Amino acid sequence: MKKTVIELFAGVGGFRVGLNDIHGFDNNGKAIENRDWKFVWANQWEPATTVQHAYDCYVTRFGNECSNEDISKVDSKDIPNHTLLCGGFPCQDYSVARSLSKEKGIEGKKGVLFWDITRILKDKKTPFFLLENVDRLLKSPSKQRGRDFGIMLRTLSDLGYNVEWRIINAADYGAAQRRRRIFIFGWKKTTKYNENIDYIGPKYLIAQEGVFARAFPIEQEDSKYRCIDLLQYEDTVDITKHFKAEFENSGIMINGKVWTRKVTPIYEEPITIGEIRENRKSLDKYILTGEKLKKFEYLRGGKKILRTRPDGTEYYYSEGSMSEYDSLDLPGRTMLTSEGSVNRSTHIIPDKETGKLRLLTPIEAERLQSFPDDWTNTGMPEKRRYFMMGNALVTKVINRLEPVLREIIENQ
């Protein structure tokens, strides 16, 4: 089977950077792709901004095969056939209800991007998919933990897919950032790969032979499996109303039945902030001085603030102190879209030349996500470069999954 890919919610191309082992670009700004995954289509659209910086970056690096329109308005007929669908999508409300119009059946809320993913999977009969989301997806919503993921899994099962997932902290496997994300791999029950799955069995897949166990080895310990039968529910509306179960950080769904267990990674030495720190001189614009430095000292310090609830009662909001700056001997913390702004979560490091405290540079932010240097230096403001990296994934995770995905698809 050909290795053809579409990338949804593409951002600045993280899945493509990882799958095609991209480390830089040529004099024209075009990415130098070192593997042969053929990206036949991509979509990137930011509804909140007039200037489409992420799309512009994607086109600069890869060319014009990227769509820049609301994915919900894209007709599936206009999307090329493909073997692998990939994309990182936000954690939203996945609850469903019966529509007032019986012809429409069960409907999810408008604007929830997962339903666009499932529409495309259904219409294009995509053999394989790889998705990324925040780790809290497994426990959402807070008042009915696990419900949203249960709805997603049952929906995918009804579409003819089996699914494997794992929460991966990139730093546990040698990356430069402590970033926990859930990765979800799915395959059609009609694929040759599914025939092999039947012989192996779900527990062995989670422990040793699955996509994630092969790429990201785990300790072979005797943790208990939890079994969840999603077919006991009439449909996803029933799951929305009555779901009660907990998902662990690893699991697999086969024919609507789930096996899930907590797994422990076999830890690898991570890349440290000290290793990704820029060596070049004259980074004065990033050095903290005066009021800005005082503001960070306050934000990172411990505090106890008297606040008032809506009902008028008072309480103290407490916040523990952080170290003055981020250790150069550790990987970075989870980078947010607010990186580089005056914010408690922003990284602060000592400058190599002067020893003074400073912000990360956009290049260092790119290195935390395993992107090539200056990947986002395509004309967007620096503030947006940080934003793009805060929204991106650690491409090293995808790069590491690539050999396993390649073997599966080439053997189809």
What is each stretch, according to the model?
Residues 13, 47, 90-94, 135-136, ...:
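Short, solvent-exposed loop/turn segments at secondary-structure junctions
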Residues 7-10, 83-84, 170, 336, ...:
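Short glycine- and Lys/Arg-enriched binding-loop motifs that mark or flank ligand-binding interfaces
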Residues 74-82, 94-324:
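Class I S-adenosyl-L-methionine
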Residues 1-125, 134-149, 157:
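Core alpha/beta nucleotide-donor-binding catalytic domains of modification enzymes
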